[in-house]
Amino acid sequence: MKVGFIGAGKVGCSLYDYFVHNNILVTGCYTRTQANVSGTEKQTQKIFTTSIDKILTKSDVLFLTVPDDAISTVWEQVKTYPIQGKFICHCSGSLGSAVLSGIEATGAYGYSIHPMFPFKGKKTAYEDLAQALFSVEGNEEHMEEIMDLLSACPNRIVRLKSEDKPKYHAAAVFASNLAVGLINQAKELLNECGFDDEAALNALKPLAVTNMNNIFDVGTCDALTGPVERHDIKTVQKHLDAIDQEKKETYSALTKEIIKLAETRHPDTSYADMKHVLELSLIHISEPTRP
């Protein structure tokens, strides 16, 4: 099957190159104006057009690689064309194929195909993207045809139920976006110790990267180290005493989570006293300030 794209952003351009690299036929990419195409992109062998009709005519599968809040708008435009028998896909992690409202009446088949990957730019290394999970949700009757198309790529591909999309996307956000917030709070604590931003991130990098690699090597339970794993309540209390209320909330919530892992690892140890310390810190946070 031949693939076309609407949207020449980071995801669209990266998938375009990646599909070509994996011998999937790509017809081109629609962009509203040629001015949206950078000089670097013009030097590549990508085909860009300002005609949706041309892309649709040449393509069996159309990827709407546009921001989430633009998918329904672009779809409303696409479905005014004759698209019977075509596969219409978007790449949103949070939205399901249902965002392609009324697709059954057009005779086309709707899918959400999401690469679980942080696209940093329009050029993504093939070997990096090859490690990403692709999730597929949508029309069951023609699912095998989409799976066959994607099987040209070396990625692991899984089917998702539409009702699981929000949890699936939340998992991705926990591992990616929220991890940024967590590192930012760690950086701010080092800022308070006199580190500038660069020095703070350089200090945190080997710790964070090594620990993250360890998690994926041995699993979350066996990767756990630190005061919670050692049942070191005094150190936990010192941390809570030293940080502001906003960071206490983060620290307490995540410490409760890793206590679950510690309890699995050390079933004969009671963590009730540590949980009590955390509960007290949260009670103090929720208490109104008295005049």
Stretches with model-predicted labels:
Residues 27-31, 88-91, 134-137:
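Short, hydrophobic beta-strand segments that form beta-sheet elements in well-ordered domains
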Residues 44-124:
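Rossmann-like NAD(P)(H) cofactor-binding subdomain of soluble oxidoreductases
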Residues 283-291:
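Conserved small/polar residues in nucleotide/adenosyl-binding loops
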Residues 213-270:
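Interdomain hinge/lid region at the active-site interface
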